[in-house]
Amino acid sequence: MSWIVKLGKKGKKIVKKIITPAEKHYVGYTRRIERVKTGERICAMTFDDGPMGLPASPDRFEGKTLTDVLLDTLAQYGAKGSFDVIGDTSENYPDEAGKLGSAAWGGVKFDHYPDIHCDDKGGAVHNDRLIRRMLDEGHQITNHGYRHIIFGKKPFVYGAREYLPGFDAAVADLTRLDTLMRERYGYTLTLARPPHYVDKMAGGFTSYDVYERMGYQYMAASFDGAGWLPSTHEDPEAALQAEIDAMVEPMRKALEKDPDFFCGQIIFQKDGYNMAKRTPVAFALGKQLELLKEYGYRVVSVGELMEESPFTDVGRDDPLFEKLVALAKTRAIVFTDNKLRLDDKMTVGELAMLLAPHDEAISRRVAQLRKTGKAGPYDGAMSYCRENGLIDASTKAEDAVTKLPDAMFDKAIDFTRRNVYAAYKMEE
């Protein structure tokens, strides 16, 4: 395992814990989905950075591409996946390979998939057959960026990396892949994951702003399948076996300790080389799926998992569930960590997000960020609601709600989020 990656991740955790204030979640149209609430033994798997048009490494599958090997394995177990694909990294030059085993193994300034100078073997642009196979076999495709360029600075591990200059560039990059999938395959993308989970961008924007503009949800993960980290063994066979074990044993131990551990979870996987240019996922995926099968799990796409429940803290047993699901399709009611927090008091900012139209809330916030470089998460919605008399002009976003517009609500028992949403009159 690369010590610099380990050190970077550990350092980031320390900084977050000691120096950085706790992340403040807010109600928005886009939320980060790591898992959902369910008592059913159902979980999802995601596969980043493909499709890969090169064989597994080592190749013990008669020259089949890695993506074909993964699709064959999923089919064997009746499982479905969410393939978080890229478009094409062939524009990511000039560049050079970094040290094998490091985070820069495939490129110092940019990522290259499946490898530097092999860009024509990776991504949706160059792998029409693999994309069509994914779709024909019922898998989901999600947007991991056309060129897989990080959205902003990431000094701990990717300090030398080029990054997108801002909001417009990120929207343009995602739109290229979105358009490709729509025009070539008639497929609508609904989920996305930012390259290397970099969220903060220039100008005060974040990945959430970009995804709100695109109409996406943020697909994260709650369990790391571990296939991307290299072993330190010098012997190639020992290294491969160690990497396979690192993918299988944590899953085995988690299930032995709690058979319901993976209920509603999203498992991260890699559709490509790890940092040592091996593909342990080709050998470990079947072992993982066998384990999950033994414990009675169904492995589905993230989209299907969200049909079970789209929320982290509210499931089908909640009496308000169906209304909340319907509301969340057109209104901002869920926090960015995918929780509803129904029993807490609602604030005026959260009420404004419920009442303001999607385009108004987003466009006004974006305009304010362009103008000043600063904007609160509710500023766009607050601006609209003040102009239209839906909230008092003197109230602040953090104030508690004390009254509701009569025309839009039945009488509420109190102003918890649960009762406000229950009282809201759904549009016909």
Region locations from a protein language model:
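Catalytic domains of cell-wall/extracellular-matrix polysaccharide-remodeling enzymes
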Residues: 119, 123-127, 133, 146-293, ...
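Short secondary-structure capping/turn micro-motifs that flank functional sites
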Residues: 90-91, 150-151, 198, 227-228, ...
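Extracytoplasmic/secreted proteins, especially bacterial periplasmic and envelope-associated proteins
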Residues: 42, 65-69, 126-129, 165, ...
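Short secondary-structure transition/capping segments
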Residues: 94-97, 154-157, 230-235, 346-349, ...
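Short strand-loop junctions, especially beta-strand C-caps/beta-turns
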Residues: 48-50, 86, 195-197, 270-274, ...
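Active-site beta->alpha N-cap acidic-glycine motif
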Residues: 3, 8-159, 165-189, 194, ...
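Sec-exported extracytoplasmic/periplasmic mature domains
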Residues: 75-79, 135-136, 175, 179-186, ...
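N-terminal propeptides
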Residues: 308-428
